Structures are given as C-alpha cells and as structure tokens.
Amino acid sequence: MTPNSFAYIVFLVIGALIYHPLPQKAKKPFLLLLNSMFYAIGGVKFLPLLALTVAFNFFAAQKLERIERKRGLLTLVLVLNLGALGLFKYLGFFGELLGCTGVQLSLPQLALPIGISFYTFVICGYMIDVYRGREAERNFLDFALFTTFFPAILSGPIERSKSLLPQIKQPRRANADDVRFAAERLIEGTVKKVLLADNLAILVNTAYADPAQFSGLELAFAAVAYALQIYCDFSAYSDMAIGSARLFGITLMENFHAPYMAQSSKEFWHRWHISLSTWFRDYLYFPLGGSRKGKARTYINVLIVFALSGLWHGAAMKYVLWGLLFGVFQVIGGLLTPAKQRLCAALHIPWDAGWLQIIRVVITFGLSTFAWIFFRADSALQACAIIKRIVTAAGACFPLNLTHLGLTERALHVLAVSLIGLVLTDIIGDRFPLREKLLETVWLRYAVWVILLAVTAVCGAYGTGFNPQEFVYFQF
C-alpha cells in the first residue's frame, strides 16, 4: 500500500476520521494499531522483528540512562541495531567482497524488511541522544509510536526524538489549516509522482535496460531524466508523508528544499534528503571531529561520511562510488572556492552576480547528474560504459528522437509542460513563499487543486498507457 494509491488515501482518511473524535486515552493505542496495520500490509512477516527492535531499544535506553559507564552499552546497542540492518541488507554484498579476495563463501541474500534502513537510523539517533544526556522515554506506547509512525516508516523523513516525541506525548487535534496543508502536500506529491516521476521512469528504464542501443546524446538525456526522476519521486513521497502526518496533528521535518537550485555540492546536501544529511552530520561527522581538526582531517571526514552514506543506500560498490563522488565534489569545492573568490575580487566581479549564480547552479546540477549515473546503473561497470558513450558522443543523433525512449509524443508533451511547471516552482519558491502567497486566496487554492487533480487523472493515473512505478527509495 503506497502513498500514491487509492487504498492508502482511504486508509489515511478513515484513520484520521476515527482518530480525532476518540477520547484522549484511546488516541495513542488506536494510532499504534494504525501503524501496525500499515506495516503488516506491507510485510507482516517482518512485524515481529520491528516489535522486538522497539522493545529492546526501549529498555536499553533506560539502562543506558542509569549506568555510569555508558560508552560500552551504547556501542553494544549500536552494534546490535546496525548488525541487524547489515544481516538483512549487506550479507550477500560481504560475500561478494570476500570473493574478490579469493575466499569463496556463498552467503544468502535475505529479504529486506521494509523501512529497516530508516527506522534503524531513527532508533540509533535516539540512543545516541540518550547517551549524550537526553532523558530516556519512560512510556512504552509513546516510544513505539515514535519509532513506528506509519507516514515516515517506509522512507522517512528520519525524525529526531526531540522533535517527534513531544508531539506524540501531547497529541494535538488537527485543525482546518492542518487539513488544508495536508491536502496540498498530498496533491503536490501525487502530481510529482504520477505526472513526472513515473513518466520519467519510462525514459530512464528504457535507456538503462540496454545502453548500447542508444546514442551518447540519448544516454545524456536519460541521465538528466534520472536526476529529475529521483528528485520528483523521493520528494513526492516526502510530501505525502508530511501531509499524512499533519492530518494527525503531527509536523514532520521538511526533507527537500529545491536541491537543484544549489550553487555547490555542499549546498546541494543542505537541500537534498535533509533528514539523512543532518543525521550523518550530527551522529558521524561531528563525532569524527567535523572541521575542528584542520583541513586535511575535515576532508577525510567528509569522504568517510559520504562513503558510508552511499553504503547506507545499497549493498553495492556503485552506491559507495556514488557517495564518494559527492564527497570528492565537496572536497574540490572547498579547495577551489577561496581561489575563485579571490579571482572574482581581482576582476571586480561580485561573487553574488546573477549570471555567476546561474553558472554555479548549472555546474552543480551537471556534477549531481554525473554522480546519479552510478546510482541508477546496474553496476559500476555499466555506469562507466554509459559515461564513456556519452563523453565520446558515440552514435550521436540530431535531431534527438525521444520516442525511442518509450514515451509517446503526447506523453512527452505532458512531461515537458509538467517539468516547466516544476522548474518554475522551484526557482520562484526558492526565493519567495510561493505556495503560501498563491494559496492565500480561497477560490484560487481550490481551483489549483481541481486543475492539478484533473490533469493527473487524465494524463497520469488513468491516462492511456500509464505505467505506475514503485517509489525508488522503497528498495533502501
């Protein structure tokens, strides 16, 4: 049951309608029931593992708070939590790595419990917070709701205890503004997913299925299409998760802020998957020393963080290389930026000149798109082959015929218009509160909702040849 399905909307609306009229004492047990039902629908066989994880960490946190020698227990708890993640996610990968050393060991690839990468990080962050002095949660029901909240458990945002737990402990009734906000985010997410991400996926999947059949120009277009697809797909899920939570009076953190408007790779990660990047910053980068121990150590820390970020995404070398690429981009950016600023000063060019900002945005988008090739390719070898074909412009064709990539001409027109709308929304919304201003007028708000839903229904969910795709981050 995915957030863009009719079944999910029914589940969400009925759940919210039952939840709010309930007596205060009944709200939390009912919400836990909703969480359990939602998770069971996606993978009932993994529900006992989730329950065991929640119970173990609830009691471990209280023990951690009481004892004086905390480091040993924290290490044990983190090893057990991350070990469970590693068992399900990386066992087969470690077998492959051993094979590279000549040791032949056949290790099974276990089925991945849904949401385990996300709820494991939520729990590990909570345990580190307790180690650092946060009071351990005493109410098991509150802790269970915090770790299993259904809008966020599949693909985030990766929430923190200081933000989400107080909202769970003191439930708030959703008001009219919450309902309007929820509707806006659910509609926005549906449009991004159905009109943009799923149509872009057809282009991308066609090109990456057999790259040798396409020209360098077509593969370059597919690379750009994937950069846009994964943004629309993942931000769509985050929109729907944030909107769903608001129906229960709960505010989740924003996960994206116009990432392709970033002017550097460092800024990109301040705007992209914000809950994950801040998690790595607070629980790994800062403990490693951050930027406090000199430039060399800072850059090493950056590379470590990005390599592990890549590994978190998947058990394959291509993900590690993807992460390292972003780390290298940040290191090079950190080394070159002072020189570039001095050059601008010498030439009397303002660093914040509009045309210069545009150039930086384009370069950053290009670097991000390059890295995404490794993320999407079947392997690092395939990624290198695609890059080679793009760079050498093998089989370049003009004019570009995009119907080769699986979409009809009509679908391409719809996609083009939708992309223009997305780009304009991000450009304007990056500098001005676009959504708030546009939707201040009641009739305009409802007109926008109706138009977007109608276009999505005609050209997307019920349109000719519509091919629904699973959310990309569900595999992680």
Predicted regions: what they are:
Residues 1-425, 429-475:
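Membrane-embedded transmembrane alpha-helical bundles that form the catalytic cores
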